[in-house]
Amino acid sequence: MGQKVHPIGMRVGIIRDWDAKWYAEKEYADYLHEDLAIRNFIKKELADASTSTIEIERAVNKVIVSIHTAKPGMVIGKAGSNVDALRAQLNKLTGKQVHINIIEIKQPDLDAHLVGESIARQLEQRVAFRRAQKQAIQRAMRAGAKGIKTQVSGRLNGADIARAEGYSEGTVPLHTLRADIDYAWEEALTTYGKLGVKVWIYRGEVLPARKNTKGGK
């Protein structure tokens, strides 16, 4: 069977940057576990705030966390109360000084994490899986996507045998490295077990910046 490489990992260093921006040698394992703890904690604390990518940068005894969210007001809170509480909890969790940047997602319908999360939450509320996918596709195309593909897998409608069913519209060129494709995978916890939700969104081409070489044309 043909297997598909992770669309984001394949494009790192070409048109996408790393979500973790730090370098370490002996401390690598410790930093990696700390990153996982930070991401899991933020996802749990901000479960209703439509958070997507979490970027982590490191300096000496300082951690800079950039949270991409569609609801910045909910994350910041009244007079910054929520973000201050979150910063204090992360300081305690890591034992380091944590700085938090809040970045607003202008078009949540073009973010694969948020689209996948929306489909998963609808499936948990017993919305038909075909309807949830088709509505998400329509919203993404109206928001300006060049193409979108979704897939839901598991015991669909409580069937005894698990299967996968997906829909797509437009083009999703997975082999084109300059194609800006956002990908995400989410889970829905239903009475019949877990359902997996995959989303690919093609947002257009990104041409990597040309490097100036001495004496080059």
UniProtKB/Swiss-Prot annotation:
Claim: Manganese is one of the keywords in the record: no
Domain KH type-2: 38-106
PROSITE patterns tied to this protein: KH_TYPE_2 (PS50823), RIBOSOMAL_S3 (PS00548)
CDD domains, per the entry: KH-II_30S_S3 (cd02412)
Matching InterPro entries: KH_dom (IPR004087), KH_dom-like_a/b (IPR015946), KH_dom_type_2 (IPR004044), KH_sf_prok-type (IPR009019), Ribosomal_S3_C_sf (IPR036419), Ribosomal_uS3_bac-typ (IPR005704), Ribosomal_uS3_C (IPR001351), Ribosomal_uS3_CS (IPR018280)
Tree of life domain: Bacteria
Family, similarity comment: Belongs to the universal ribosomal protein uS3 family.
Quaternary state and interactors: Part of the 30S ribosomal subunit. Forms a tight complex with proteins S10 and S14.
Designated name of the protein: Small ribosomal subunit protein uS3
The organism of origin for this protein: Streptococcus suis (strain 05ZYH33)
Phylogenetic classification of the source organism: Bacteria, Bacillati, Bacillota, Bacilli, Lactobacillales
